[in-house]
Amino acid sequence: DLETGQELWQCGGLSRNVVASPVAGHGLVVAANSYDWQAMLAIRLEGAKGDITGSEQVVWSLKRLTPYVPSPLLVGQKLFFLRHLQGILSCVDIRTGETAGGPWRLPLVRMVFASPVAAGGRLYVVSREGIALVFDHQQGLNLLSANHLDDQFSASPAVVGDSLLLRGDRYLYCLKAASQESSV
């Protein structure tokens, strides 16, 4: 409770080492881990009270390919998430947990710490190895480009207007569409 600081609800099922940020949408909050074990839980916020572990408030759960470092990304009803040391991207319907695409092994990348971002109908994934992948995610997952940058990336990209900001270990990059007809 924001006014009193009292705990409203709690839910077990994740390890104590949760790095990825939770994602909220469609009346649910989704939290995940994969350090000690792999787990992702979707919790219905309405009516959540007390210890909801194993209750009907937990709408769905996954036990494989869950993220450790990169946070999941919600685009409409699609929840995208990365298995950070394997370069595997998965997608589920946030409402049901049912597969909505993938899993896809991403080309050229293995280690991903940065969270994926989406803008202009495109999905962006940046790897520790300096590879920035751009996908069309409207129908499946289609690779549009793979950009090799002379840097390593742990920070998540930021979309600002029609620009994409990437913070590498050595440089800050600003990528912008080449023409007004295309967008970030």
What are these regions (language model features)?
Residues 1-184:
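Noncatalytic, solvent-exposed loop/strand surfaces
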